[in-house]
């Protein structure tokens, strides 16, 4: 049975995540306050950040940057796209 959370990102009730997706207190906060749809939106945004900025998830500085962007994206709603980013054209 799925759980329902009030998603901070969507500002509405949403289906909750099935597991804690991130370590530590931030992971617990995400589990309690973020829905599946919002988490999928973050994963897509994170992929774009990694690709456009040529980040390595193994680099501690890059991980710190991604964690800061995660918080801005999900909880502050003010994450920016990389400079010069052009969204792909879909057919």
Curated annotation (Swiss-Prot):
Transmembrane segments annotated in the record for this chain: none
Gene Ontology BP annotations: cellular response to oxidative stress
Keyword Iron applies: yes
GO CC aspect terms: cytosol
Statement: the UniProt record of this protein carries the keyword Iron: yes
Family: Belongs to the Fe(2+)-trafficking protein family.
Protein name according to UniProt: Probable Fe(2+)-trafficking protein
